[in-house]
Amino acid sequence: MNIQRAKEIVESPDMKKVTYNGVPIYIQHVNEETGTARIYPLDEPQEEHEVQLNSLKED
């Protein structure tokens, strides 16, 4: 996923279907400098991770 699209998803009021390794996730924050996003699985909000944007897929 590119940085611009990830930022659009974060700013959107609508929930978008995004996955990380096949797991549905929520994007909390996009770091443009490092090309990463802070995410968590929808079913485990306490499990935050910092991942590369190119590992995220929009369904």
Curated annotation (Swiss-Prot):
Pfam families linked to this entry: SspH
UniProt keyword terms in alphabetical order: Sporulation
InterPro entries cross-referenced by the UniProt entry: SASP_SspH (IPR012610)
Localization (cell): Spore core
Main location: other
Source species, domain of life: Bacteria
Swiss-Prot/TrEMBL GO biological process terms: asexual sporulation; sporulation resulting in formation of a cellular spore
Induction: Expressed only in the forespore compartment of sporulating cells. Disappears after 45 minutes of spore germination. Expression is sigma G-dependent.
Disulfide links within the chain: none
Gene Ontology CC: one annotated term: endospore-forming forespore
Similarity section: Belongs to the SspH family.
Protein name: Small, acid-soluble spore protein H
Organism: Bacillus subtilis (strain 168)
